[in-house]
C-alpha cells in the first residue's frame, strides 16, 4: 500500500495539495535554492498538509495541529525547493511514529471549541522510519539556547497560500522577512489566548506573514531556529494582526527528552 501511495505521488510529479489546514506565506519571495535545507514538507498519504523542520537525521519537528488520526500515512519530503516537481536533491521518508506535545489540546482539531481558545504547546515530533541523508540540500538545524530578541528580523518559510483569502499554494518554497514583536501586540489582536510559550511575529502594517499551509514550518531569527508556525489572522497578514508561533526555547527539554527516549 505504501509503495502504491508513493508511486502515485511520484507519478503526479510530486505532491497533491490538501484542503487548507491552518497557516501560509503572504508578501514573500522565492527562497534561494537550498537556502533552507532543514525545511520539510509533511504529507498525509500524498497530500501536502504542513511544513516541518529537520532537527536530526531521524527527527522532524512540526505543529501538533498537523496531527491526523491515521498516522501510518504520515510521510515527509526533504531537500525540496519545488513542491510539485521531481528533484534530484529530494528524499522521501515515512514517519514511524508521531509525538504530539502531551499538553496540546487535541480537541482543538475538531474545530468546535468555544472562544477563547488556548492553542499553546502546538508542536509535534515525527520519528522517521529511516535517517535522512545529509547533503547540501538536506541539513538539520539546532534548537535555540537562549531567548530571541524583540525587534529581531526573522525569516519564515513555507509552501502555504500566497493569497490572503483564496487558498493558492506555490510550487516554489517561499520566504518572508518579518519582525519579532511583543506578545501584547498579538494579545490585542485576537480573542484566542496568547501565552508565554508563543511568539508574536509579523508587520504592524500587514501585507507580510505566514498563512494556510505554512503551519509547522520554521521561524529563523538572527540565524537561529526560534519558532514553529502555529496560527494567525483570517484573512492572513492583516494590519495589526501578526502571526503566532510556538516558542521553541520553552520546549527544548521536552524535545530532547522525547528524542533520547525513542532512539
Curated annotation (Swiss-Prot):
Gene Ontology terms for molecular function: peptidase activity; serine-type endopeptidase activity
E.C. no: 3.4.21.-
Activity regulation info: Strongly inhibited by protease inhibitors diisopropyl fluorophosphate, phenylmethanesulfonyl fluoride and SBTI.
Active site: 65, 122, 215
Residue ranges of the propeptide: 18-24
Region forming the signal peptide: 1-17
SMART domains tied to this protein: Tryp_SPc
Domain Peptidase S1: 25-260
Tissue expression profile of the protein: Expressed in testis and submaxillary gland. Not expressed in heart, brain, spleen, lung, liver, muscle, kidney and ovary. In the testis, expression localized specifically to Leydig cells in the interstitial tissues.
Glycosylation: residue positions: 69, 105
Keywords recorded for this protein, A-Z: Disulfide bond, Glycoprotein, Hydrolase, Protease, Serine protease, Signal, Zymogen
One biological process term in Gene Ontology: proteolysis
Glycoprotein is among the record's keywords: yes
InterPro entries per the UniProt record, alphabetical: Peptidase_S1_PA (IPR009003), Peptidase_S1_PA_chymotrypsin (IPR043504), Peptidase_S1A (IPR001314), Trypsin_dom (IPR001254), TRYPSIN_HIS (IPR018114), TRYPSIN_SER (IPR033116)
Disulphide bridges: 31-175, 50-66, 154-221, 186-200, 211-236
Role noted for this protein: Serine protease with chymotrypsin-like cleavage specificity. Shows activity towards casein, gelatin, IGFBP3 and fibronectin but not towards laminin or collagens I and IV. Does not hydrolyze kininogin to release Lys-bradykinin.
PANTHER family to which the protein is assigned, alphabetical: KALLIKREIN-1 (PTHR24271:SF47), KALLIKREIN-RELATED (PTHR24271)
Similarity comment: family membership: Belongs to the peptidase S1 family. Kallikrein subfamily.
Protein name per its UniProtKB record: Kallikrein 1-related peptidase b27
Organism from which the protein derives: Mus musculus (Mouse)
Amino acid at each position: 500500500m505504501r509503495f502504491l501511495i508513493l508511486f502515485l505521488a511520484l507519478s503526479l510529479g510530486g505532491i497533491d495539495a490538501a484542503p487548507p489546514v491552518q497557516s501560509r506565506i503572504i508578501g514573500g519571495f522565492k527562497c534561494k535554492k537550498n537556502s533552507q535545507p532543514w525545511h520539510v514538507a509533511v504529507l498525509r498519504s500524498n497530500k501536502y498538509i504542513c511544513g516541518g523542520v529537520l532537527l536530526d537525521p531521524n527527527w522532524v519537528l512540526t505543529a501538533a495541529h498537523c496531527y491526523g488520526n491515521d498516522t501510518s500515512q504520515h510521510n515527509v519530503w526533504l531537500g525540496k525547493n519545488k513542491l510539485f516537481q521531481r528533484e534530484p536533491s529530494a528524499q522521501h521518508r515515512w514517519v514511524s511514529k508521531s509525538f504530539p506535545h502531551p499538553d496540546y489540546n487535541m480537541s482543538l482539531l475538531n474545530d468546535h471549541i468555544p472562544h477563547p481558545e488556548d492553542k499553546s504547546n502546538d508542536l509535534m515530533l515525527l520519528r522517521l522510519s529511516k535517517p535522512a541523508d545529509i547533503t547540501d540540500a538536506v541539513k538539520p538545524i539546532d534548537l535555540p539556547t537562549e531567548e530571541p530578541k524583540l525587534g529581531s528580523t526573522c525569516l519564515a518559510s513555507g509552501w502555504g497560500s500566497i493569497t490572503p483569502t483564496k487558498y493558492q499554494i506555490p510550487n516554489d518554497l517561499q520566504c518572508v522577512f518579518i519582525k519579532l514583536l511583543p506578545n501584547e501586540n498579538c494579545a490585542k489582536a485576537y480573542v484566542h489566548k496568547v501565552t508565554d510559550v508563543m511568539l508574536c511575529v509579523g508587520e504592524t502594517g500587514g501585507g507580510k506573514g505566514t498563512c494556510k499551509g505554512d503551519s509547522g514550518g520554521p521561524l529563523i531569527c538572527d540565524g537561529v531556529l526560534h519558532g514553529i508556525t502555529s496560527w494567525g489572522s483570517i484573512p492572513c497578514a492583516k494590519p495589526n494582526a501578526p502571526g503566532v508561533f510556538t516558542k521553541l526555547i520553552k520546549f527544548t527539554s521536552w524535545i530532547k527528552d522525547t528524542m533520547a527516549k525513542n532512539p
